Amino acid sequence: MSTLRLLISDSYDPWFNLAVEECIFRQMPATQRVLFLWRNADTVVIGRAQNPWKECNTRRMEEDNVRLARRSSGGGAVFHDLGNTCFTFMAGKPEYDKTISTSIVLNALNALGVSAEASGRNDLVVKTAEGDRKVSGSAYRETKDRGFHHGTLLLNSDLSRLANYLNPDKKKLAAKGITSVRSRVTNLTELLPGITHEQVCEAITEAFFAHYGERVEAEIISPDKTPDLPNFAETFARQSSWEWNFGQAPAFSHLLDERFTWGGVELHFDVEKGHITRAQVFTDSLNPAPLEALAGRLQGCLYRADMLQQECEALLVDFPEQEKELRELSAWIAGAVR
């Protein structure tokens, strides 16, 4: 019986694919070596410990129907579209070794005619006339008895969209001598015009088989039926939930301020696990009562635009004469936290 397992997803849903990954990882035998190949439609994928409001332009994502997905590994935020091929290698310990999976991907690229090399801990780069350019980024997860290495390969991703949805740390970029996110990366189509997702998957699969000296039939994961994986429904529900994707953000504070015709408003929020734990309101409005009431109502509220709007509009019952001000305030707060 083969020690290998190969799974290929036909779904473009990031929550579905990450749930498949999680289920396989949890239930795989320690002696198995797994390769999972997949890709996502328009999505920003953030690391397990990241704050989406800090890392992403969540308002723009909502306007453009770009999903947010939190993965279970660490690392930074990345934009996925169908021009990305995603791979996940899994193995039990002590055999799990990310240098093996990295070499498999490098061998696959080499077979396609691309000479790439590992750079730092997470990246694969190619040499271009403009210097080294990243074509792959990775992240890792380990438990007591197993580990996985997952990453992306840029085939023909729309790189102009990266800046639309990601807010890179400018200090970090400056420290590395990088002027923009776009200048760091390149698509494999620049080196191999016409390269397809299917060709890349085939090359990685063949390199995987060659490394282990075994072959196995691929299991196709269809989006049209629930995968036969233990606890998939529960895992998918968690992976697609607001509580996981947004609510798992580390504690943070948010200061909002705006001047309206009727006065200036400053809101201070402390947020933990996606809930407002403290709300303070400062204003020079001649009628501060509704704003003071709002501060009380927002304590414990989900840090979500629709919930904040709901709390603002609930004040119309007690302060009907301030309807204009409260509706302006509601629209502003909702826009500011999207």
Curated annotation (Swiss-Prot):
Belongs to the LplA family. Pfam families: Lip_prot_lig_C (PF10437), LplA-B_cat (PF21948). One of its GO terms (biological process) is protein modification process. Keywords: ATP-binding, Cytoplasm, Ligase, Nucleotide-binding. GO terms for cellular component: cytosol. It is found in: Cytoplasm. Catalyzes both the ATP-dependent activation of exogenously supplied lipoate to lipoyl-AMP and the transfer of the activated lipoyl onto the lipoyl domains of lipoate-dependent enzymes. It catalyses: L-lysyl-[lipoyl-carrier protein] + (R)-lipoate + ATP = N(6)-[(R)-lipoyl]-L-lysyl-[lipoyl-carrier protein] + AMP + diphosphate + H(+). SUPFAM superfamilies: Class II aaRS and biotin synthetases (SSF55681), SufE/NifU (SSF82649). NCBIfam families: lipoyltrans (TIGR00545). (R)-lipoate binds at K134. It comes from the Bacteria. Residues 29-216 form the BPL/LPL catalytic domain. In the transfer reaction, the free carboxyl group of lipoic acid is attached via an amide linkage to the epsilon-amino group of a specific lysine residue of lipoyl domains of lipoate-dependent enzymes. This is Lipoate-protein ligase A. Transmembrane segments: none annotated. The lineage of its organism: Bacteria, Pseudomonadati, Pseudomonadota, Gammaproteobacteria, Enterobacterales. Pathway: Protein modification; protein lipoylation via exogenous pathway; protein N(6)-(lipoyl)lysine from lipoate: step 1/2; Protein modification; protein lipoylation via exogenous pathway; protein N(6)-(lipoyl)lysine from lipoate: step 2/2. GO terms for molecular function: ATP binding; lipoate-protein ligase activity; lipoyltransferase activity. Monomer. It comes from Escherichia coli O1:K1 / APEC. ATP binds at R71, G76, A77, V78, F79, K134. InterPro entries: aa-tRNA-synth_II/BPL/LPL, BPL_LPL_catalytic, Lipoate_ligase_A, Lipoate_protein_ligase_C, LipoylTrfase_LipoateP_Ligase. Its EC number is 6.3.1.20.
